[in-house]
Design a protein with these regions (language model features):
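Serine-esterase "nucleophile elbow" of acetyl-processing enzymes
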Residues: 1-49, 55-60, 73-76, 84, ...
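Active-site micro-motifs of SAM-dependent methyltransferase domains
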Residues: 13-14, 51, 92, 182
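Alpha-helical cap/lid subdomain in secreted, periplasmic
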Residues: 40, 64-213
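Acidic carboxylate-rich catalytic motifs and surrounding loops in phosphoryl-/glycosyl-chemistry enzymes
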Residues: 46-51, 177-181
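Short secondary-structure boundary/hinge segments and terminal tails
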Residues: 53-55, 184-185
Length: 213
């Protein structure tokens, strides 16, 4: 039976292109690349929203970016699921949202608990969970982005270690996005086409393992 994978994330999953201030071509977005590598053995659902946080309100946003509040509805929409990939935390680095890697880690833990405790319809089994640390924020000459993430370079560099420890504690899979991808200096937080493709390719082995493919 075809496996179903939900990619729950922010603009990195949506496919924001800092170079064009638009969206990467469908085939370049990491969930699309992951789909291509898995072929007909799995169906990969991209659920990305620009600005989404793990579990915090962004009162400057024009839509609900709180990942914890939206997640139960998304889970219900796409059930049954075999794997949920969580790639969030970069937007939590904004001081107006949370401002620390510790807060982002707490938020990821909240999402894991929501998935584990979800009232799945029709007695569906719950999915496996893969926590992915987003590639760390890098230096940029883009003044608005730099001003939005003061301290973000240092804090985001802590995410991989915190997420790895959390995954071990909660029995989730873990993948470090920094192992295959780097953020673009155009704005310091997003991925260019080459790096978003690299993320999709890099995730294939652990996703196959967790799906039993």
């Amino acid at each position: 039976m075809t496996k179903t994978v939900l990619c729950y994330g922010d603009s990195l999953t949506w496919g924001y292109d800092a170079d064009t201030i638009g969206r990467h071509a469908y085939e370049n977005r990491w969930p699309s690349v992951l789909q291509a590598t898995l072929g007909s053995e799995a169906r990969v659902i991209a659920e990305g929203l620009n600005g989404r946080t793990t579990a915090f309100d962004d009162h400057l946003a024009d839509c609900d970016r709180n990942g914890a509040r939206i997640l139960p509805t998304v889970l219900q929409t796409h059930a049954p699921l075999d794997l949920v990939i969580l790639l969030l935390g970069t937007n939590d680095m904004k001081p107006v949202v949370a401002g620390s890697a510790f807060a982002a880690c707490q938020g990821i833990g909240r999402l894991v608990r929501l998935i584990r405790n979800h009232a799945w319809p029709f007695e569906f089994d719950g999915p496996e969970i893969l926590i992915v640390a987003p590639p760390a924020i890098c230096a940029t000459g883009n003044a608005p982005f730099a001003a939005s993430f003061p301290g973000g370079i240092e804090e985001s560099a802590k995410l991989a270690t915190l997420y790895r420890d959390l995954a071990d504690e909660l029995g989730c899979g873990f993948f470090d996005g920094n192992s295959v991808a780097r953020t673009t200096p155009i704005d310091g937080i997003h991925l260019d086409a080459e790096n978003t493709r690299a993320l999709g390719r890099g995730l294939e082995p652990i996703v196959r393992m967790m799906l039993g493919l």
